[in-house]
Amino acid sequence: MYICRNHPLAKQKSISFEQLQKYPCLSFDQGDNVSFYFSEEILSTNEYPRIIRTNDRATMLNLMVGLNGYTLCSGIICEELNGDDYVAVPYEDANNPNSTMEIGYITRKDNTLSKMGTLYVQELNDYLQQESKKMQQR
């Protein structure tokens, strides 16, 4: 889950659903015709006491800072692009067993990725390994 660096829960090793109840959940709205299977957030069908939907990433990032909001998204918040005002904290919740998200890509059967596609996937894997190490050091 992503929150701003100054959020009261930012230094936690992990965060549960109960700990988030008093903060607004920020959801990225991709429109009415998008299946929840393609949602960028885990637990997108949960009921939240306070939820703000936006279709603009800059607005979402500003609301994280201004309102101590959070998002349970799969999006990568890249420090080089967005600054270091945001942190990822593991979301762990025994009451929500579907709180992990698998991210992948789809290719046509019997096709291989292009050189550019292979490079892109490798860069993503490298980035995720770096971020995983950062989270383990917390």
For each predicted feature, which ranges?
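A conserved hydrophobic position in a structured secondary element of the catalytic/binding core
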Residues: 4, 55, 73
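Short glycine-/acidic-enriched loop or helix-start segments at secondary-structure transitions
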Residues: 12, 37-38, 81-83, 117
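Secondary-structure junction motif
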Residues: 17, 23-46, 75, 113-121, ...
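A residue-level structural signature of the nucleotidyltransferase/glycosyltransferase Rossmann-like core
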Residues: 18, 52, 69-70
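Short beta-strand-to-loop elements that line the ligand-binding cleft
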Residues: 27-28, 46-59
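Beta-alpha-beta core module
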Residues: 58-109
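Non-transmembrane alpha-helical segments in soluble domains
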Residues: 61-64, 121, 125
